C-alpha cells in the first residue's frame, strides 16, 4: 500500500463495491451472501485506509480535499452498517452503497491539495474545526440515509396501492426473493421509523456543527456580519429539518409528507456542497 497514492487506495473499496453488484444481479441465495460479504469487506478496507492514514499523518493542522471526501464516504458507510445491524434491514446496503462508491470516485479525482488550518486557527480552534467537520459529516450521512429511505417509502407506498411489493427485479417465484424481500423488509412503519431516527439523531449533530461553524467564522473574520453563500444554504437546510422535526414531534407528521420533507432537505445539502467546493474556490472563506 505504501507504493500507492492516496487516490489509488480509494479505488480499492470502490471496485469492491462495484464488483459486488455483479453477484447481486445473479439473484441467487448464495450469491446474495457473497454480495453482503463483499460490501462488508469494502467497508473494512475503507476503515484500514483511514486508520493507516491516521497513523501516518494524524491531524497535524493539515487536511487535504480528497481525504475529506474519502472520510465522508467512510462515515456514510459506518452509519449504514450500524442501521443495518440495529434494524436488520439489509436492503439499505443495496441502495446507499452506490452513494459511498460515488464519494470514493470523487475522492480519487478530487485535488490532493492540503488546507493549512494550522496557519489559520489556534490549537483550540483546530479541535473545534475537526469536531465541526465530524458532526456535519455524520449529520449529513444520516440525512443521506433518510433521503434513500424516503425514496424507498414513496415507491413502496405506490407499489402497495397497486398490490405489488417493491423489488429490484420483477421476476416471481425466485429463491432470492424469499431470502431478501420477505419479512419486515419494506414495511412502511419500519421505513418511517428509520427515517425519524435519522432525523432525531442527525438534527442535533447538524445544529451543533453549524454553531461551531459560526464560531469559527467569527474567529477567522472577527465579525458575524460577513455572510457567505454556504452559510445561507446551511441555514436554509437547518430550517427545513427544524420544521420537519417540529412537525413530527408536535403534530405527529408521518409517512409520505415526512418523506418528501427529507428529500427536499437532502437536495438542499447537495446544493450546499456544490456551492462550497465548485462554485466558490475559496469555500468557507479561506483557501
Whereabouts are the PLM-identified features?
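Short hydrophobic "helix-edge" motifs at membrane interfaces and signal-peptide entry regions
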Residues: 54-55, 121-123, 218-219
Amino acid at each position: 500500500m505504501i507504493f500507492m497514492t492516496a487516490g489509488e487506495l480509494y479505488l480499492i473499496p470502490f471496485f469492491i463495491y462495484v464488483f459486488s453488484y455483479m453477484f447481486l444481479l445473479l439473484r441467487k441465495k448464495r450469491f446474495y451472501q457473497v454480495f453482503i460479504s463483499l460490501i462488508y469487506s469494502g467497508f473494512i478496507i475503507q476503515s484500514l485506509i483511514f486508520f493507516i492514514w491516521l497513523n501516518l499523518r494524524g491531524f497535524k493542522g493539515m487536511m487535504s480535499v480528497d481525504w475529506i471526501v474519502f472520510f465522508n464516504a467512510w462515515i456514510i458507510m459506518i452509519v449504514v452498517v450500524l442501521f443495518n445491524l440495529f434494524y436488520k434491514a439489509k436492503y439499505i446496503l443495496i441502495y446507499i452503497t452506490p452513494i459511498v462508491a460515488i464519494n470514493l470516485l470523487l475522492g480519487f479525482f478530487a485535488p490532493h491539495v492540503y488546507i493549512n488550518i494550522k496557519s489559520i486557527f489556534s490549537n483550540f480552534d483546530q479541535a473545534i474545526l475537526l469536531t465541526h467537520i465530524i458532526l456535519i459529516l455524520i449529520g449529513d450521512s444520516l440525512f443521506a440515509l433518510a433521503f434513500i429511505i424516503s425514496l424507498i417509502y414513496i415507491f413502496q407506498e405506490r407499489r402497495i396501492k397497486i398490490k405489488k411489493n417493491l423489488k429490484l427485479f420483477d421476476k416471481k417465484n425466485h429463491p432470492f426473493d424469499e431470502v431478501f424481500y420477505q419479512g419486515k423488509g419494506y414495511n412502511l412503519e419500519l421505513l418511517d421509523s428509520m427515517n425519524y431516527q435519522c432525523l432525531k439523531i442527525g438534527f442535533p449533530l447538524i445544529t451543533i456543527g453549524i454553531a461551531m461553524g459560526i464560531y469559527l467564522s467569527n474567529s477567522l473574520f472577527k465579525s458575524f456580519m460577513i455572510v457567505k453563500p454556504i452559510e445561507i444554504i446551511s441555514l436554509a437546510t437547518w430550517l427545513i429539518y427544524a420544521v420537519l422535526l417540529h412537525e413530527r414531534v408536535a403534530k405527529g407528521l408521518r409517512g409520505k409528507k415526512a418523506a418528501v420533507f427529507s428529500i427536499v432537505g437532502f437536495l438542499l445539502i447537495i446544493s450546499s456542497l456544490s456551492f462550497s467546493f465548485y462554485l466558490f474556490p475559496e469555500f468557507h472563506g479561506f483557501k
